Amino acid sequence: MESILEDEIRFKSELKKSISKMNFNYSKKPLVYISHPFLTHGSPEDNLNSVSNVLSDLVLRYKDQFIFISPIHNFGTLDGKLNYEDGLKICLDLLERCDGIIMCGDYIHSNGCMKEMELAVKKGLQIWKLEDFK
């Protein structure tokens, strides 16, 4: 029993040393959240295709200025596995870590997008419409 405990202590100590030696080179580019309807107006597949096009266009055009993140790509596979409120909470948790938000698609009629915009306003994040990037 003691050898297992000693092994665990040794492992944690070595892990701590290796992490402290790592040279993390974090990007200074703003992290921008792509807000797009998922279940509103159209099928999830149609909305995934739409936001996929938006994401690839933005990354190809602005890869040197921004890092873009799409909650639909991160969490879309959880549709039907989480209730709406829990799914939205996960998206809002991600948005909390971002520097800005881009409102896309028919966001005005999407409850989720409007909640995301509400949080962005509350946090003082930069808010853009997709048209601002054209």
What is the meaning of each model-derived region?
Residues 1-134:
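Conserved catalytic or regulatory cores that recognize and/or transform ribose-phosphate-containing ligands
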